[in-house]
């Protein structure tokens, strides 16, 4: 799978940013560093939640280590059809059609009718609806 990532030093990360842990794009919810001891450099402890699976993951690395950060794109699509657990979307720039899981948020899922414009995020080859696109 061709995943768009960039290499970043651990010291450049902070809460709210994104990181790849176990090949899953995650949002950092906790970032703590321990001061360097007699031997070795400072270490960072990162707690992050998977963007697509919601699982909590922990990573401990030296602050000068390089880690992968996912390239996350936010795009606009139109709902083509409701297919039960999934909805078919059409990207408004490329006109590509694809299926995505319905969001777990019941209020958001109930608004997904054919013709509705939605905002979705794409990272690591996965897609997820993040909200309804308001009319401008």
Swiss-Prot record:
Disulfide bridge positions per record: none
Protein biosynthesis found in the keyword field: yes
Keyword Ligase: no
SUPFAM superfamilies: Nucleic acid-binding proteins, Translation proteins SH3-like domain
GO MF entry, a single one: translation elongation factor activity
Positions of post-translational Hypusine modification: 38
Main location, first listed in the record: cytoplasm
Cited PROSITE patterns: IF5A_HYPUSINE
N-terminal signal peptide: none
Localization of this protein: Cytoplasm
Keywords, ordered alphabetically: Cytoplasm, Hypusine, Initiation factor, Protein biosynthesis
GO CC annotations on file: cytoplasm
UniProt record similarity statement: Belongs to the eIF-5A family.
Function field: Functions by promoting the formation of the first peptide bond.
The protein's name: Translation initiation factor 5A
Originating organism: Methanopyrus kandleri (strain AV19 / DSM 6324 / JCM 9639 / NBRC 100938)
